[in-house]
């Protein structure tokens, strides 16, 4: 289960005691979760007004950055196409897997200097992730256009003889070319009707060249045959052929056009290969950047909410729980027993659903302790 609960509780005599109490109740004694300390440095508190406003801003920023993280991860899966099993190993943060990064989280002092105000730090994060989001849109658009154009050409060369491009199938020798009077048509003949074709094609219209039909290709259901006749008999031949379930394809042999199509396909294929490597590298780097930013936002939210709830001086312990999938309900109950004294209005919530005025949270999300979920299930495979 790649879901974490990031919680905080006020320090008792020491923050270490708070941690030991939680660890004993959730991990040591009953294996409800894997627990670890979550290290948040001494950030600048600022004024109460700023903290209240920042609490709302960080909630919005959290949702935005989570969305960007998921978009980058999902686009990585789209780009890797047949290698989706390899996607997870490319989704790293600071070169390690996501679980390791979260459980060993250390604040990045270089990127987000703690001498800056909380608001400034949140603005640095917002600016960086907005840039990633904009870059992703432009890179994805360019790559998707290239991929789409290539797929369109590939589709033309796939499918049945009734619909696919015939340029790759036929040769110059299959046609009478540059004749004032004669023309070669290509006809799709159902295999079940092939004997009828052999018997009838010379008499479907006047002026069909005898013994001019050969099988050029076949698929599961049909043969592709050529036939040569006088140009003025083409319309009549088409009409009679259709009546007998023989389909004349619209095709003119043009070497220049065929060469241009082939060159275009080769160019697109080469361009796609050239762009693939740098794009995957960009996605890896920027997934890491966005994910790191996201976890720093979680740390900011815990800090701000803990100060707002537990007051000053700053005295709380942030802790990370990775719930045992089968014990989620029990874990919630244990946490409730540990911390229900912190907020009398929340004491009944676990048993009795209720709305709390002034809180934009459903009752399932509000607890007497500070709580934020980190869900590392970032991919939705189709």
UniProtKB/Swiss-Prot annotation:
Expressed in brain (at protein level). Its main location: membrane. The keyword Ion transport applies. The keyword Transport applies. CDD domains: V-ATPase_C. Keywords: Acetylation, Cytoplasmic vesicle, Hydrogen ion transport, Ion transport, Membrane, Synapse, Transport. GO terms for cellular component: apical part of cell; ATPase complex; clathrin-coated vesicle membrane; extrinsic component of synaptic vesicle membrane; plasma membrane; proton-transporting V-type ATPase complex; proton-transporting V-type ATPase, V1 domain; vacuolar proton-transporting V-type ATPase, V1 domain. InterPro entries: ATPase_V1-cplx_csu, Vac_ATP_synth_c_sf. It is a peripheral membrane protein. Gene3D superfamilies: 3.30.70.100, subunit c (vma5p) of the yeast v-atpase, domain 2 (1.20.1460.10), Vacuolar atp synthase subunit c, domain 1 (3.30.70.1180). One of its GO terms (biological process) is synaptic vesicle lumen acidification. SUPFAM superfamilies: Vacuolar ATP synthase subunit C (SSF118203). GO terms for molecular function: proton-transporting ATPase activity, rotational mechanism. Pfam families: V-ATPase_C. Belongs to the V-ATPase C subunit family. V-ATPase is a heteromultimeric enzyme made up of two complexes: the ATP-hydrolytic V1 complex and the proton translocation V0 complex. The V1 complex consists of three catalytic AB heterodimers that form a heterohexamer, three peripheral stalks each consisting of EG heterodimers, one central rotor including subunits D and F, and the regulatory subunits C and H. The proton translocation complex V0 consists of the proton transport subunit a, a ring of proteolipid subunits c9c'', rotary subunit d, subunits e and f, and the accessory subunits ATP6AP1/Ac45 and ATP6AP2/PRR. PANTHER family: V-TYPE PROTON ATPASE SUBUNIT C (PTHR10137), V-TYPE PROTON ATPASE SUBUNIT C 1 (PTHR10137:SF5). Subunit of the V1 complex of vacuolar(H+)-ATPase (V-ATPase), a multisubunit enzyme composed of a peripheral complex (V1) that hydrolyzes ATP and a membrane integral complex (V0) that translocates protons. V-ATPase is responsible for acidifying and maintaining the pH of intracellular compartments and in some cell types, is targeted to the plasma membrane, where it is responsible for acidifying the extracellular environment. Subunit C is necessary for the assembly of the catalytic sector of the enzyme and is likely to have a specific function in its catalytic activity. This is V-type proton ATPase subunit C 1. It comes from Rattus norvegicus.
